[in-house]
Amino acid sequence: MKSILNDFLLMIQFFTRIPVNKNLQCEKVNFRRGAFFLPVVASIIGGIEFLVYLGLKNFLPPNVIIVLLLLFTAMITGGLHMDGLADTCDGFFSLRDKERIIEIMKDSRMGAFGTIAMIINLLLKYQLLYSLVLKDCSIAIILAPVIGRISILFLCLSKRTAKKNGSGNIFIGNMSKPIIFLITIIALAMNTYFLGLKITIISFIAVLIITYLFYLLCLNKINGLTGDTLGACNELGEITFLLILLMM
């Protein structure tokens, strides 16, 4: 039980700005086991946002609430995944060789492509969530972050790291297939309950396809994965999921 709590808190500490203030075991095995809790943490964040939406929907217009929810997400996660998307776009669209792309991705300064990617990402999320709320599909506020994190877990099944060192290396190739299978089944069951089997299957397949295509792009550009590409994958997974929901 103690190890389970350790791994759960480790995911909160690593992926959010929530102050855990606890000395935790941070070995690779802890991150391997803790991967189970990554979608769980996402569902908790999404659940809080959903409650905020329910609490405000009688007082504020939905478009204002969605902006506040996006702001809340950025604050509680530190913009971790969006930053990964921005860094990835800065590097990949620079049209340089592998070593230079990785150097650009490591640069803390945001370039033109990263800025454009972040703006488009936020605009898409805003419009998609706003449109889904108007369609009485506000449950997407909870489900999208979960699916995004699951896309990260599938990407991490690869052992291809683009750098010798990096925060992403503690996850890349350090995944347990039974854990991913279990958390995927739970997520699919939850989605089926709220969305129905047809939408669940189509949206999940679409996210897997986008994840795999993005993986091929990473291999082509930098011959592997980094922490930034994991964050980018999360954003792509969420956007894909929301797009499918709106189309259905």
From Swiss-Prot:
Assigned EC number: 2.7.8.26
Cell compartments where the protein resides: Cell membrane
UniProtKB keywords: Cell membrane, Cobalamin biosynthesis, Magnesium, Membrane, Transferase, Transmembrane, Transmembrane helix
Membrane topology: Multi-pass membrane protein
InterPro entries: CobS
GO cellular component terms, A-Z: plasma membrane
Residues that span the membrane, as ranges: 36-56, 59-79, 113-133, 137-157, 170-190, 199-219
Cofactor(s) required, per the database record: Mg(2+)
Family annotation (HAMAP family): CobS
Its job: Joins adenosylcobinamide-GDP and alpha-ribazole to generate adenosylcobalamin (Ado-cobalamin). Also synthesizes adenosylcobalamin 5'-phosphate from adenosylcobinamide-GDP and alpha-ribazole 5'-phosphate.
Protein name as it appears in the record: Adenosylcobinamide-GDP ribazoletransferase
Organism encoding this protein: Clostridium botulinum (strain Hall / ATCC 3502 / NCTC 13319 / Type A)
Organism lineage: Bacteria, Bacillati, Bacillota, Clostridia, Eubacteriales
